[in-house]
Amino acid sequence: MIIKEEMYIRSLKRKRHIDIYVPDDYQSAKKRYPVLIINDGQNAFFDEQSYIGKSWGFLESVRELKLDVILVAIYCNFEPLKREDEYGPWVMNQEFSREYDTHRLVGGEGNAYVTFLTTQLQPYLDQNFPT
């Protein structure tokens, strides 16, 4: 089962779409599940959402291998260069930023993104799912 969430990222002051795959019996099973967090999550499950028209096949792999796992697919930021800002732990120098044909420096929000993962997303998952 896939649960669709929209989460406000406090450390970045913006929203993000998240798909959470849980095993069908997760509510009735008396066990905990490991969690795999997937960045660029729009590519994780469905061909029609993937930027190349073919998903990364996480659902097929989990089902084929009969893995008991919760998959958390966080969509990237689709605003121009915001993906690079969020995944980049430091601001890139002017020469590198020029490769993106921009008049501003790129990157530098990586720590805020990791803060979201560790202080907001993981506690949310721990509260709402058997992790």
Where do the language-model regions lie?
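Non-catalytic cap/lid and distal C-terminal segments of serine-dependent acyl enzymes
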Residues: 1-131
